[in-house]
């Protein structure tokens, strides 16, 4: 399997878990002299004709490599800023008889933008969750003299980033990196994982006792427009002398406001359930 990551980071290797084979979701439809690429997860009403014969195409390794090279060139010059594809592609590579494109959120809108703005080919198969996965995990924001807080208690729901502060009031040096996770509570009160790109730079930071660390997290609103409500930010640190890993979590809010505020009590009124 040949693999190339469009965004290189710590999680840059594809999963090799023994999962059931996934049927190709790319197929070619011939309508007269025109060949059209479709997706099995897109409903039949989105197709150009009412009835057609769909057949999986098989490509050689050499053909896939040529398509992959062309994909890199087209992606580099594609105009996807502000679309559902912006920040959504985590990688691509040859897998079996197809060129697989991994999406943070494998939505019909993202696939449509890819075909229009980047490449439309029956060789391409899209992988990734079709909806945000449930995630009700919780951790503390304060332990052993280590504290994690949002810089502001509320950010505009249209914001692309949120900032967080890590305070080290312990007697230990703590190590940390770029990786983080975010979950959100939807309108039904169910917590789900926010679809963000989890390819992070492999860098490390040392926070000495008595120091603090300010960092930024991307909210990826182009992939899935965020709603006003409650969000959780997860961040792992390590006591360097003890090699002890600690997962921290802090809550923050997105609200219908123009600028971030430190006290959200007067600007937020969100009903859940």
Where are these predicted regions, by residue range?
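C-terminal motif of bacterial Sec signal peptides marking the signal peptidase cleavage site
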Residues: 7-9
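Primarily secretory-pathway and cell-envelope proteins
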Residues: 131-201, 206, 236-273
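Short glycine/threonine-rich beta-strand-turn micro-motifs
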Residues: 21-24, 28-62, 80-115
């Amino acid at each position: 399997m040949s693999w190339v990551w469009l965004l290189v980071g710590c999680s840059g290797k594809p999963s090799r878990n023994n999962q059931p084979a996934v049927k190709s979701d790319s197929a070619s439809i011939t309508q007269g002299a025109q060949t059209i690429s479709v997706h099995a997860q897109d409903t039949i009403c989105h197709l150009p004709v009412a009835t057609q014969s769909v057949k999986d195409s098989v490509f050689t390794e050499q053909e896939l490599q040529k398509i992959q090279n062309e994909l890199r060139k087209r992606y580099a010059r594609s105009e996807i800023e502000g679309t559902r594809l912006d920040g959504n592609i985590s990688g691509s590579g040859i897998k079996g008889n197809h060129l697989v494109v991994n999406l943070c959120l494998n939505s019909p809108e993202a696939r449509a933008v890819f075909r229009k703005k980047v490449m439309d080919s029956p060789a391409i198969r899209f992988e990734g969750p079709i909806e945000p996965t449930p995630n009700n995990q919780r951790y503390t924001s304060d332990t052993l003299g280590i504290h994690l807080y949002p810089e502001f208690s509320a950010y505009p729901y249209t914001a692309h980033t949120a900032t967080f502060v890590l305070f080290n009031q312990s007697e230990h040096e703590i190590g940390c990196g770029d990786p983080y996770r975010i979950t959100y509570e939807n309108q039904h009160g169910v917590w789900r994982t926010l679809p963000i790109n989890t390819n992070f730079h492999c860098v490390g930071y040392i926070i000495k006792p008595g120091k603090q660390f300010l960092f930024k997290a991307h909210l990826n609103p182009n992939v899935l427009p965020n709603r006003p409500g409650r969000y959780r930010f997860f961040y792992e640190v390590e006591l360097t002398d003890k090699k002890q890993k600690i997962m921290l979590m802090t809550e923050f809010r997105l609200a219908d406001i123009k600028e971030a505020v430190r006290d959200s009590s007067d600007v937020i009124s969100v009903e859940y359930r």
